[in-house]
Amino acid sequence: IQTNLWLRAADRIKIVVGSFPAKTFEELFQGVFALDWENYLPLGAKFPISKAKCVKSKLHNEPSVQAISKKAVVKKLQKHYARPEGVPLQENGAEFRIEVSILKDVATVMIDTTGSSLFKRGYRADKGGAPIKENMAAAILLLSNWYPDKPLIDPTCGSGTFCIEAAMIGMKIAPGLHRSFAFEDWNWVDKDL
């Protein structure tokens, strides 16, 4: 969870719930159902299947992948929490955005801990004209062999993204310090982190 606060060049941090072969919709359903959802999703959690991506796979209909994955999670939670099948689960608690990626017939199921992308640092209200994303500027600085004890020349000097990111690196300020994250509402995350 600290990774959301401190990683400068990442876009999102996801928890991998599991991976399994999925060449058919039945294999997808059984694979998602077999995962330990009760370790992540408390009773009442909202759990949209926010994204599905299929690449070089027999399964390629992404809306169907989302619908089948949602059905499998619902069935698993109904079983675990001893809820009747005909009664829908209440989804009025914290949100856990689930993503399903199928690459070469192997499904990977993840939960997004970040929420909005990590380039949104929270220090900028107006982006200015054509800025580089903050995480990209930080990545370029980290790869450029620049160190905080050396001068930094920013020839682009647009909206100041390179200079702001360099100052944050030099002063060891966490890039996620002034923003919120999806995981902050989860009951199993230590709030003192």
What would you call each of these model-derived segments?
Residues W37-E38, P88, R97-E99, L143, ...:
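A generic local secondary-structure boundary/capping motif
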Residues V109-L143:
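SAM-dependent Rossmann-like transferase core, predominantly class I methyltransferases
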